[in-house]
């Protein structure tokens, strides 16, 4: 699995266009429609820097955030304390619990009413059987009829957006960091359906020089029928698959699938 240690500091800058409030609206709409009530406890699997976890916490949800990167969770914890200090998270709001665990073998203290997994995190499960194993664990920790909501990158995105394309992120200096520059190179193998990402990060130090760090990541492209099959084999009922946060129908050029599944017990 990727540890995200190098990219942790710029992860939120790279994903600055993500609308976490709209994503949370989607989850709350599903809770209302399919559960009829707010789940008492929600798992955010592969929570990263905790942006989604904290957005849900602001809305009064008791959250557990699980991620395999200690660096990402350190960012999440810092963000939590910043929200407490600023009053953005009210005194009566439950405080999220962050756990550093691999999503292929995580353990919880009990069950949850719903589980979410955002930003194609499940595509990082590249080994044979790993997706099904993760689904099985999620099912194990869900209450009867609990919801599992997640998204995955599509074959179209791997072929046409990633492919062998390179992307550059230029991040200006801020209050707590110098200027940063990230080069993201993709190499997608259509035969193995594995995409390798090579990230090079340049960070400005206090003396004006730039320090270089490198990180490699890898995602697997899953077909829609593979995801459906893995859900069915692990005891889930697939409720819906849509193309966007607004519930759009699937199309040939869909970049991201959004799934809602229910745990059958």
Task: Please give the residue ranges for each predicted region.
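C-terminal lobe and adjacent flexible extensions of AdoMet/dcAdoMet transferase-like proteins
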Residues: 218-265
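SAM-dependent methyltransferase
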Residues: 149-228
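A short acidic, Gly/Pro-enriched loop at the edge of an enzyme's catalytic core
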Residues: 107-114
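Residues lining the SAM
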Residues: 118-120
């Amino acid at each position: 699995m990727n540890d995200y240690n190098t990219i942790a500091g710029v992860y939120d800058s790279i994903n600055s266009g993500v609308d976490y409030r709209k994503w949370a609206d989607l989850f709350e709409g599903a809770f209302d429609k399919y559960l009829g009530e707010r789940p008492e406890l929600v798992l955010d699997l592969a929570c990263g820097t905790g942006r989604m976890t904290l957005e849900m916490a602001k809305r009064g949800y008791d959250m557990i955030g699980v991620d395999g990167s200690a660096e990402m969770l350190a960012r999440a914890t810092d963000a939590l304390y910043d929200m407490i200090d600023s009053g953005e998270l009210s005194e009566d709001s439950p405080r999220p619990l962050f756990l550093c665990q691999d999503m292929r073998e995580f353990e919880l203290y009990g069950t949850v009413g719903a589980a979410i997994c955002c930003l194609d995190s499940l595509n990082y499960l590249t080994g044979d059987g790993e997706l099904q194993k993760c689904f099985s664990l999620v099912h194990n920790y869900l209450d009867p009829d609990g919801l599992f909501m997640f998204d995955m990158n599509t074959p179209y995105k791997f072929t046409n957006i990633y492919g062998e394309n390179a992307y550059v992120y230029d991040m200006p200096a801020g209050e707590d960091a110098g200027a940063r520059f990230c080069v993201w190179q993709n190499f997608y193998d259509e035969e193995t359906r594995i995409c390798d990402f090579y990230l090079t990060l340049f960070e400005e130090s206090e003396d004006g020089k730039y320090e270089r760090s490198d990180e490699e990541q890898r995602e697997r492209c899953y077909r829609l029928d593979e995801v459906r099959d893995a859900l069915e084999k692990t005891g889930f009922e697939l409720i819906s698959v849509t193309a966007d946060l607004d519930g759009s129908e699937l199309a040939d050029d869909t970049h991201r699938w959004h799934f809602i599944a229910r745990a059958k017990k």
